[in-house]
Amino acid sequence: KVLKYKVMIDPLTQKLDSEQYNWLMRYGYIDASINTNIIKLKETKEMLWSHIKKGHKHNIKQGRKYCKVAVWDYSNPDYEKHELYRLMHHKVSGRITRSLKTFELQYDWLKNDEAILIGLFFDNKWIAFGCFVHLNKKAIYSSSVQNPEELDISVPLGHLMIWTAIEYYNNREFDLLEIG
């Protein structure tokens, strides 16, 4: 006898703006939808920029003023930078939060054009990293880390990482980016 059955519908596989987003409810399933943000990337950069809130635009501009931004993908994988990303996770959390194997998988995805790593450099040190995974012209903001001990600036860096990913995926003509 089945007491519980869980089914997930990935929001990136559905038609956006559709009334039929959770068709399982017609069969008695409970709607336990996630709350997420999905960016449609099939617009010009100018149009994408126009959708961003004023405060976020300010944060992006401030981040660019202070930080050098780097993107690593299949064309320029850098194991050393990926290791810095992994070690920063360990340092910031104060413990090992996930196995080495998961980081090795992320690096393999990077080499196989299934992910990118974004890094922010300030005052001669890497201060933040963000990992985005992708498949079939759709991308997901997967993981990020910022080292507050290294920050001599009070600028939210997440907005700059997300905007960098938007630009990257827009240039590659991706359809969607889920940012959580």
Regions found by a protein language model. Give the residues of each.
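Structured catalytic/translocation cores of nucleotide/phosphate-coupled proteins
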Residues: 76-79, 120, 161, 166, ...
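Conserved GNAT acetyl-CoA-binding A-motif
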Residues: 2-12, 169-180
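Conserved acetyl-CoA-binding loop-helix of GNAT-fold acetyltransferases
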Residues: 1, 152-167
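A short, hydrophobic secondary-structure junction motif
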Residues: 32-33, 165-169
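A conserved beta-strand-loop-helix scaffold within acyl/acetyltransferase catalytic domains
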Residues: 10-153
